[in-house]
Amino acid sequence: MSDGSGRYVPPHIRRGGGNSHESAAADGLSGSRYSGNGFFSSPNRGNHKSSGGFFGSRPFNDRRTGQGSRASGSGGFGGSGGRYGWVNGKHVPYPKNPRLEMELFGNATDHVTSGINFDNYDDIPVEASGDNVPEAITEFKSPPLDELLLENVELANFSKPTPVQKYSIPIVTKNRDLMACAQTGSGKTGGFLFPVLSELFLNGPAPLPEHTRHSYMRKCYPSALVLAPTRELAIQIFDEAKKYTYRSWVKPYVVYGGAPIGQQMRDMDRGCNLLVATPGRLNDLLERGKISLVNVKYLVLDEADRMLDMGFEPQIRHIVEDCDMPSVNDRQTLMFSATFPREIQHLARDFLKDYIFLSVGRVGSTSENIQQKVLFVEDYDKNSALLDILINEIDGLTLVFVETKRMADQLTDFLIVQNFKATAIHGDRTQAERERALHAFRNGIANILVATAVAARGLDIPNVTNVINYDLPTDIDDYVHRIGRTGRAGNVGVATSFFNSNSMNIAKELMDLLTEANQEVPQFLVNMVQDSMRFGRGGRNSRTGSNRGRGSNTRDYRHSNKDDWGSLGSSRRGFRSNDNRGFGNNWGSSSGDGFTNKAANSWW
């Protein structure tokens, strides 16, 4: 490039000039690639929409402030003259940005308040097994948490840790691996984000590998990797990470299938220290050489049982064992979920070392904050029963679960004709349509969301007061995750399920679950279970083929005898690998129903 006189101007001189790219970014000019045409500010990105993108001005996106991208000209540590970020071996928080703060945290009145039963969480039994279990904390404080992290937690309106956080925070900060099982809606996301981010804030970025210092290719070197089974859950975790990395040197990013990979690769050039990913898209980026895992200090598997048990095991093993990720002894591995069947605990041995098993409440149990109702409704009466509930009993956001994509569209159309503001989410809808549907539901534009199992696990949608199982799932663990979309963070909710003879395979487990949660067990369910047991039918878990039974899945199976442990071994089982679960083909739905999705099946 030349100046006005035609003379060549070196890049380091151009960067210092008033027309530099970085100056434009710092000033928030629309011409900057950081401000209006990137992933974070795309108008079709639902909750990611923002004027100027998530990172905003340079203090939130300058690559020089922290390791994470190969584009850093000085090895990723501070840049010459950098005043904020990781500077001279110390974390210097960026100044407050009121506009970004409002965008991330909203007004105090926007937050989901702790419900009337939040304090009852202190009475939930907690079991922590393993060697030298760290003492639980009772409040958010420093230490063990970093001061900046505490400020961001306060901005998010969290005043006290949930039971899983009370234990997970000291466990992670003491450099221990963790397998954590807790009720849905009990703060598992904060259970790993809080301590991981706090440790990153305190310890700073790892140096780039020596052999990469002079590489011409831009590559991201995340310090923390979070794997999630669905793109909706990945986006949700990323949204939370944006809040808690506010004003820090850590840059979060999310990658998932269904979005343009080229745009994701360009966005990662800005740096990525905490990466949230679905396994398929991450494998793609690893094969393209865009990401290196050599600096990963923290590996988190959220909804780990679903990823391992439902077909993601080969992809996860490739990521963990065949790429350049540090070995199990050189990283911390954290596994979080609401259910952990014994087989999955056995598989976890390959990913964790000397770990602590944390069980908050009964593993796979439901929260007593959820009032559970089971009604006997034949298939041909379901629409009428649903209307009766929606008209007479429900106020607030309602999540309706069905088994097939076809039924999701048909039921949504039916509700719209009945003048309800409804929308649908399932695997045949495009990514933009799904994000718009979730955005409308979260913000009350549509107060009814009809969903297949794609939305059943992990999603934290505030203010969902009612869950209706129009179709019951075939697996009792899926039932737990579905109804866990309400009654979150200590708030109360109602879950209503339509039961008939088609759901007999979970009848016994459902009755046990209702009993354990101190819920009313309808007499028809008791009679049907007794009849099925008399004739040797029902009461079997469809996935494992074994009786769940009261109190099963609660203990640390390392305490089982050797024969029990060795019954499954650590061999790689032939699970089907498909990152399109919940993306192109929907979990729990009929993928071959021949139904063509109607993009217009939303009331707006």
Swiss-Prot record:
Polar residues biased stretches: 32-45
Q: Where is this region: Disordered?
A: 1-79, 535-591
UniProt motif (DEAD box) ranges? 302-305
Q: Where is the composition biased (Basic and acidic residues)?
A: 553-565
**Disulphide-bridged cysteine pairs:** none
Q: Subcellular location, in the record's words? A: Cytoplasm
Q: Any idea which positions bind ATP?
A: 182-189
In this chain, composition skew of type Low complexity spans 541-552
Q: What is this protein called?
A: ATP-dependent RNA helicase DBP1
Name its species. Answer: Candida glabrata (strain ATCC 2001 / BCRC 20586 / JCM 3761 / NBRC 0622 / NRRL Y-65 / CBS 138) (Yeast)
